[in-house]
């Protein structure tokens, strides 16, 4: 069956190109999918434009749109097993992680399905008799949604659900490495009753399939989650038509541990913060900042436990984390570790490719801890996006804040302390979109997600996540019109 979904039809690529998708855990062939080029994407944009300008979707009521999203949530639950398996095959992540993701994805559709019916505008009190003044919400238009490979369907849901809730039409381009759950989602949207052209899917690499999404005049908004350099290029491309842009560009996230923290919990969560999904998480706590008096004991325990983490494929029930996404990405991570060692970091564990049965064929890299790091090191400043933990020391609150904020990113981070006042002070001073106190990684669809500084702008999830895909319009109606006689 063809894999591009354009104007309500499944079709192959115009130039008949295809791409093999292989599991990063063992190199096995997952499938062969159609590979879109620029012509396919332009056709998808045209379909989305027609559907927005002439089709029924933007003119449906909020309740109708919400009902469709709730139907999609039910279909996601129905197909959970197939979706989780497909996600794990494409990404290499453990099946249990993918299963959790599908639950979160269904909840995301439910949240926006319910929110849109309650967010319908407001009456404005003008203080003037004879005036009816209202602010109403309207869709932005045609939205280009570009999603990454680390959480393919989850990141897609964060964009598709609010975009549809607001009444937009869209063209979705997932990562070329992890397309299968996006294909499945478009089938579910069609099954739920989404009109032709309202949702379109193109597969392929950014320079070919993705390029028209940034500069095409018929695209009204681009929402992108991915790397900083690609985000910068998209901003530049979008500037020619002054289209709306929302960007989530990752982070280099601090995990700050004070000496008065709950030791066992802080150690446990420091491991989860950075080694979950082999560190391929935009909010990964890759920078461990430890109060100097606690440093030796804390880092020794982190190293002991990190050294025991078992690597394995998505269906290995004994595995605790999986492979990196590709050979090229593993080489990038290795280069950052090598650079860190050159700059003076101390290797405490990991740092070399593992070998053995079940590992040689995949893109595995072990949990790695680099101690005695300095703030200026590339491995501390840049997003390596792998299972690499850098460790820095601090002695005062002010120093902890300075180190935590000493990066171009500002996505997320955590503070570990038993002192509530101290936690509140740090949360207020950290330039981060999310601050966890005595926890790491949880999120809910009701609360906004996004970053400060070069982690991007715009928000996903929460009421602001819906607002990203809306325009506001003020309607002023004079109920008793009369001449002003301003001019004679």
How should each PLM-predicted stretch be described?
Residues 229-374, 437, 484-488:
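ALDH superfamily catalytic-core signature
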């Amino acid at each position: 069956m063809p894999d591009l979904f354009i104007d309500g039809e499944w079709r192959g690529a115009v130039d008949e190109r295809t791409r093999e998708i292989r599991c990063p855990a063992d190199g096995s062939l997952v499938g062969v999918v159609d590979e879109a080029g620029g012509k396919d994407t332009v056709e998808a944009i045209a379909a989305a434009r027609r559907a927005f300008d002439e089709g029924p979707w933007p003119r449906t009521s909020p309740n109708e749109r919400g009902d469709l999203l709730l139907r999609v949530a039910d279909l996601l639950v129905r197909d959970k097993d197939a979706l989780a398996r497909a996600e794990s095959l494409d990404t290499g992540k453990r099946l249990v992680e993918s299963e959790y993701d599908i639950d979160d994805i269904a909840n995301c559709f439910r949240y926006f399905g319910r929110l849109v019916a309650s967010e319908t505008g407001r009456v404005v009190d003008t203080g003037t008799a004879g005036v009816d003044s209202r602010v109403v919400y309207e869709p932005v238009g045609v939205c280009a949604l570009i999603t990454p490979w680390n959480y393919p369907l989850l990141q897609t849901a964060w964009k598709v659900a609010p975009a549809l809730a607001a009444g937009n039409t869209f063209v979705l381009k997932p990562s070329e490495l992890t397309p299968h759950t996006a294909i499945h989602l478009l089938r579910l949207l069609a099954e739920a009753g989404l009109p032709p052209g309202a949702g379109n899917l193109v597969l392929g690499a950014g320079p070919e399939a993705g390029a028209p999404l940034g500069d095409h005049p018929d695209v009204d908004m681009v929402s992108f989650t991915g790397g900083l350099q690609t985000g910068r290029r998209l901003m530049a491309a979008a500037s020619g038509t002054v289209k709306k842009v929302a960007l989530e560009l990752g982070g280099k996230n601090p995990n700050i541990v004070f000496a008065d923290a709950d030791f066992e919990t802080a150690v446990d969560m420091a491991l989860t913060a950075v080694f979950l999904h082999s560190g391929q998480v935009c909010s990964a706590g890759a920078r461990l900042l430890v109060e100097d008096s606690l440093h030796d004991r804390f880092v020794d325990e982190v190293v002991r436990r990190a050294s025991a983490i078992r690597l394995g494929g998505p269906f290995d029930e004994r595995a605790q984390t999986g492979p990196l996404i590709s050979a090229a990405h593993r080489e990038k991570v290795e280069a950052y570790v090598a650079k860190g060692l050159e700059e003076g970091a101390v290797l405490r564990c990991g740092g070399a490719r593992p070998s053995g049965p079940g590992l040689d064929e995949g893109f595995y890299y072990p949990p790695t801890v680099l101690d005695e790091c300095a703030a200026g090191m590339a491995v501390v400043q840049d997003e390596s996006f792998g299972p690499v933990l850098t460790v820095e020391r601090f002695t005062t609150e002010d120093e902890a804040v300075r180190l935590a904020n000493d990066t171009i990113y500002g996505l997320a981070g955590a503070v570990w302390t038993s002192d509530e006042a101290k936690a509140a002070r740090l949360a207020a001073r950290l330039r981060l979109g999310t601050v966890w106190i005595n926890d790491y990684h949880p999120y809910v669809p009701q609360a906004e997600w996004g970053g400060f500084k070069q982690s991007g702008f715009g928000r996903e999830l929460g009421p602001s996540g819906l607002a990203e895909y809306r325009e506001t319009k003020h309607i002023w109606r004079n109920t008793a019109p009369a001449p002003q006689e301003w001019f004679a």
